[in-house]
From Swiss-Prot:
Stated family: Belongs to the protein kinase superfamily. Ser/Thr protein kinase family.
PANTHER family: OS01G0588500 PROTEIN-RELATED
Organism (species): Arabidopsis thaliana
Enzyme active site: 209
Listed name of the protein: Probable serine/threonine-protein kinase PBL16
Tree of life domain: Eukaryota
Region (Disordered): 17-50
Lipid-acceptor residues (S-palmitoyl cysteine): 4
Chief subcellular location: membrane
Lipid attachment points (N-myristoyl glycine): 2
Membrane topology according to the record: Lipid-anchor
């Protein structure tokens, strides 16, 4: 969706390097039997998929034919490709006809995610998970699934189009303008609300693959969670966790999940802490291009998050000191608590939402000219149109330096 689909990782890249292998020899007959039953239970033809979706869906999803998708994407033209990965490709398309009861007065842009002939159990399960979860759940901070296609060997998902793409592309881009502090906190707030909604749903859901490439942005930088292929039903009743295959993305996955396969809402909280730290520093969770001791963001930054003065040294320099210092310190402490190695000591997502709310800028504040830029504009306006003498120019330069120092 938008530029959002530019970095989808193949399934084998999602598994942590420290994950325990799951060879058949290590699996007990009970687990194998359960696996076989799961395969047998999974709906595989269009009617079974539609029946299952209709029985559990809160959102009216549309079952598209493959021929309709060819029309929507101009026959999957190459210049419509938005991105791709291990699952296949994503195309930009336009729906020109009414969608059931919904009128389409003008072409509606959509993102069409085509699974590349992966009809394995895992590939079909991830595709189906998105249909089920996004069919059941509706929230402003979850990407909207419009429909799907389950025809012959084709497995396709149709989403709302997210104009600004992924947080990953915006945060780490060398071409796009740097994200302001206000926008970064808006993104964190929106993503936190999405996770909190999942954790507090009637049937709790653990997202399991929270990372910057899975957070999408609309034109107003509203954040929405996408890609529910690895999402899992959360623990219910007196259960503290669910046991599952170790999947996710290295650098974001919680350490206890990597070690044991025990998945809890706290696993998502840890991943949120990683993303919040990326927003603070402008650095990737893992970056082999940096000096050895700085390649792992958590190892490098975690000891500094509690230090009110030192933490300012790791803030993204692309923001040019244009941020409220106290808010940065509060966000850093929040990230520190999310990254606690003890999952029981991490905050709940609802508490994280409450902590981020006071850090949100008003619409008016977000539109204000940053103090350094404002000072420079003022100085330039005061300059005589016929120019300045050299000594006066130097004086103005010193004034600008002083303003920058004060702002930082």
């Amino acid at each position: 969706m938008g530029n959002c689909w530019c970095r989808f990782e193949p399934l084998n890249h999602r598994v942590s390097a420290n994950a325990k292998s799951e060879s058949p020899k290590e699996q007990s007959p009970t687990v194998e039997d359960k696996h076989i039953k799961e395969v047998q239970k999974l709906p595989s033809n269009p009617k079974e998929v539609e029946d299952l979706r209709r029985d559990s869906a809160a959102n009216p999803l549309i079952a598209f034919t493959y021929e309709e998708l060819k029309n929507i994407t101009s026959n999957f033209r190459q210049d419509r490709v938005l991105g791709g990965g291990g699952f296949g490709s994503v195309y930009k398309g336009f729906i020109k006809e009414d969608l059931g009861d919904q009128e389409v007065p003008e072409p509606l842009p959509v993102a069409v995610k085509v699974h590349d002939g992966d009809n394995s159990f895992q590939g079909h399960r991830e595709w189906l998970a998105e249909v089920i979860f996004l069919g059941q759940l509706s929230h402003p901070n979850l990407v909207k699934l419009i429909g799907y296609c389950c025809e012959d060997n084709h497995r396709v998902l149709i989403y709302e189009y997210m104009a600004r793409g992924s947080v990953e592309n915006n945060l780490f881009s060398r071409v796009l303008l740097p994200l302001s502090w206000a926008i970064r906190m808006k993104i964190a707030f929106g993503a936190a609300k999405g996770l909190a909604f999942l954790h507090e749903a009637k049937k709790p859901v653990i997202y399991r693959d929270f990372k910057t490439s899975n957070i999408l942005l609309d034109m107003d930088y509203n954040a929405k969670l996408s890609d529910f292929g690895l999402a899992k039903d959360g623990p219910v009743g007196d259960k503290s966790h669910v046991s599952t295959r170790i999947m996710g993305t290295y650098g974001y996955a919680a350490p206890e999940y990597i070690m044991t396969g025990h998945l809890t809402p706290g696993s998502d909280v840890y991943s949120f802490g990683v993303v919040l730290l990326e927003l603070l520093t402008g650095r990737k969770s893992l970056d082999k291009s940096r000096p050895t001791r700085e390649q792992n963001l958590i190892d490098w930054a975690l000891p500094l998050l509690k230090e009110k003065k030192k933490v300012l040294n790791i803030v993204d320099p692309k923001m040019n000191c244009e941020y409220p210092v106290k808010a940065v310190q509060k966000a850093a402490m929040l990230a520190y608590h999310c990254l606690n190695r003890n999952p029981k000591a991490r905050p709940l997502m609802r508490d994280i939402v409450d902590s981020l709310e006071p850090l949100q800028a008003t619409e008016e504040e977000a539109l204000l000219v940053p103090p350094v830029q404002k000072a420079v504009i003022t100085i330039i306006d005061e300059m005589p149109k016929n120019g300045l003498k050299k000594v006066e120019e130097l004086k103005k330069v010193e004034e600008v330096k002083k303003v920058i120092e004060d702002a930082c």
